Amino acid sequence: MTDAPVISPLDQARILSEALPHMQRYDEETIVIKYGGHAMGAEDTAKAFARDIVLLEQTAVNPVVVHGGGPQIAQMLKRLGIKSEFAAGLRITDAATIEIVEMVLAGSINKQLVGYINEAGGKAVGLCGKDGNMVSATKATRTMVDPDSRIEEVIDLGFVGEPEKVDLTLLNQLIGHELIPVLAPLATSASGQTFNVNADTFAGAVAGALRAKRLLLLTDVPGVLDQNKKLIPELSIKDARKLIADGTISGGMIPKVETCIYALEQGVEGVVILDGKVPHAVLLELFTNQGTGTLIHK
């Protein structure tokens, strides 16, 4: 293990000076940050992320955090002996599973992240989409083609939802008042049923409703890769759709990019897919010239 390079006071001052125009660009702007379960990693990684979020708030940025929790949910289900199945990239969520999902997302993960942000000097408020009827959802549906019959079949995903409406009443009471919303991706139906919502989709819906300056999707890959597995630093919506059509963007990256496109069409200025395991990834993206990850824009 090597020691971190020593930076002279002059270099430290230069770094801060070079960050100034970027800080001014995001002054009083809302940034929605989706923090994936895989990106959370170890406790020190999560605490470093929390410190960066507090730094954003201290520089007059309005951060809104949406967290995932797939690995943590899987771990809890395994401990309880509940089998977990996936279809079309989404967790099939039956009555027993939705209770565990809500406990892990709105309980342990949400409150742990709130604690880390508060420990770093921020004022975080932990919520989920059910609070204040913030995010209303309808039952999600997916189809798959049976490999034998070639017949398209509708998959019952259980209590998995798609955001239908975002009510900003509660969020608007927090944003801009030195409070940092930390949101678990749960929503409710018109009848009061709790739905598990994909965290990327949830973050895209919230960012779109807020007309956020940026949506950052922190994940466990560097961003969108080309056919040679090299990072694509920037894409337009048109370029992204072409890459989906020709298969360059495939698998789990497709719904992420589709979330980016949706958010942009709702008024978000730019969306970035980036590796949340990179130290200070959020600060690198927002406050440096080179940024990090893949920026998708109109």
Swiss-Prot record:
Principal place of residence: cytoplasm
Alphabetical keyword list: Amino-acid biosynthesis, Arginine biosynthesis, ATP-binding, Cytoplasm, Kinase, Nucleotide-binding, Transferase
Pathway: Amino-acid biosynthesis; L-arginine biosynthesis; N(2)-acetyl-L-ornithine from L-glutamate: step 2/4
Subcellular location: Cytoplasm
Gene Ontology CC: cytoplasm
Example GO BP: arginine biosynthetic process via ornithine
Catalytic activity: N-acetyl-L-glutamate + ATP = N-acetyl-L-glutamyl 5-phosphate + ADP
Transition state stabilizer (site feature) positions: 34, 256
GO MF, one annotated term: acetylglutamate kinase activity
Binding-site positions, substrate: 69-70, 91, 196
Class in the EC hierarchy, top level: transferase
Pfam family, one: AA_kinase
Similarity section: Belongs to the acetylglutamate kinase family. ArgB subfamily.
Free-text function comment from the UniProt entry: Catalyzes the ATP-dependent phosphorylation of N-acetyl-L-glutamate.
Name under which the protein is recorded: Acetylglutamate kinase
Species of origin: Rhodopseudomonas palustris (strain TIE-1)
Gene assigned in the entry: argB
